[in-house]
Amino acid sequence: MTAQTQELTKAQQYNFNKLQKRIRRNTGQAIADFNMIEDGDRIMVCLSGGKDSFTMLDILMSLQKSAPISFELVAVNLDQKQPGFPEHVLPEYLDSLGVEYKIVEEDTYSIVQDKVPEGKTTCALCSRLRRGILYRTAKELGATKIALGHHRDDILETLFLNMFYGGKMKGMPPKLVSDNGEHVVIRPLAYCREKDIIKYSDMRGYPIIPCNLCGSQPNLQRQAVKQMLNDWDKRFPGRIETMFRAMQNVVPSHLADFSLFDFKSIDKNSGVINGGDIGFDKEEIAPQVVEDEDLVMEFDPSLQLNVTNI
């Protein structure tokens, strides 16, 4: 091994350690903030074969080893009988991890193809079918929580989709009760950036299985919103972080939803509410400082390589 190759390997190891630590920290923080996992929980980890769910399983298994509480993980994949689906990939990978898992075989592909006209988006029907099957499976496995791999970017995309097309300020909750009222659904990656997950997935070399039903369909509204947010992220560094922070700093008295705030009762005796407002001038917004968390691209001999994986 040449000195140059050795240095590159050290730089890659440093980058991996730093990235893994950040994703673990963000995941652990989300779990704590929303009380996602409790002692004795049996978590059904929904594994689609994509980068997000692979990363979620990886990080949850890592956290499981050092967590102050005890919880179980069982990975579940839904084989929807898509033509060309590599049935051997996930069982081989999960066997190598030594994690408990279940492959559920349901031919939802044929149902979707039969019910949805050619050229129309299959996402809505496919999603409903998957949810029903996964809820049933969670009950069969005795799972107390269902973990999904949605990340911070998914949550923001959903917020803008609802504003643009649904007339609602509604995102994707990090924790909720399932549609049938029988399960608690959690999103441990809610604080994680998609670009971090992409880098981490590439470094880990997961056996990614592409979805031929929804992600590959052109002209989807979500893809348009994703492209918009990616463009903002490149042109205005920090904007994505600030927007997500805004979702955790909602001020109902300064919006217009009278179901959330009693505007009718306000009079001059009400006093200043939530900092008041500027009546005739635009409010001055202080710029938000965003920490640059990019990884090192070249090896620096001064870097400490014994990074502790929290």
Swiss-Prot record:
Q: Which residues bind [4Fe-4S] cluster?
A: C123, C126, C214
Query: Which compartments does it reside in?
Result: Cytoplasm
> Which Gene Ontology terms describe the biological processes this protein takes part in?
tRNA thio-modification
Record carries keyword Glycoprotein: no
Catalysed transformations (reactions): cytidine(32) in tRNA + S-sulfanyl-L-cysteinyl-[cysteine desulfurase] + AH2 + ATP = 2-thiocytidine(32) in tRNA + L-cysteinyl-[cysteine desulfurase] + A + AMP + diphosphate + H(+)
GO MF annotation terms: 4 iron, 4 sulfur cluster binding; ATP binding; magnesium ion binding; sulfurtransferase activity; tRNA binding
Q: Which cofactors does this gene product need?
A: Mg(2+); [4Fe-4S] cluster
Which SUPFAM superfamilies does the entry link to? Answer: Adenine nucleotide alpha hydrolases-like
Q: Beyond the main fields, what else does the record say? A: The thiolation reaction likely consists of two steps: a first activation step by ATP to form an adenylated intermediate of the target base of tRNA, and a second nucleophilic substitution step of the sulfur (S) atom supplied by the hydrosulfide attached to the Fe-S cluster.
What PANTHER family does this protein's entry cite? AMINOTRAN_5 DOMAIN-CONTAINING PROTEIN, SULFURTRANSFERASE-RELATED
What NCBIfam families does its record include?
PRK10696.1 (NF007972)
- Output this protein's name: tRNA-cytidine(32) 2-sulfurtransferase
**Which organism does this record belong to?**
Vibrio cholerae serotype O1 (strain ATCC 39541 / Classical Ogawa 395 / O395)
From the broadest rank down, the organism's phylogenetic lineage runs:
Bacteria, Pseudomonadati, Pseudomonadota, Gammaproteobacteria, Vibrionales
